[in-house]
Amino acid sequence: MQTINGNTDISPLMLASEYGQVTIVKYLLKHGNYNVKGWEKDNLHSDVSCQLTQITEISTLCEKANNPNHQYILETI
């Protein structure tokens, strides 16, 4: 199970427009190994109302999911 800052309920693909992360969310949904609720496929333990504020944490999760474009995500923003 993935954790962010010790919290296992935060989804890396939550609604992020307030934090300017719309581009990252769209990118991960299109190219990442994530389903619509935000966790790696077949690992649904998230509350999509939780908010993630660190773009670098999304990149780290992408890297752990073996997404070769995790650095590109940061460079694109």
Curated annotation (Swiss-Prot):
Organism: Rickettsia conorii (strain ATCC VR-613 / Malish 7)
Name of the featured protein: Putative ankyrin repeat protein RC0956
Domain of life: Bacteria
Repeat positions for ANK: 8-38
PROSITE patterns hit by this protein: ANK_REP_REGION, ANK_REPEAT
Keyword match Nuclease: no
Keywords: ANK repeat
Pfam families: Ank
UniProt keyword annotation of Oxidoreductase present: no
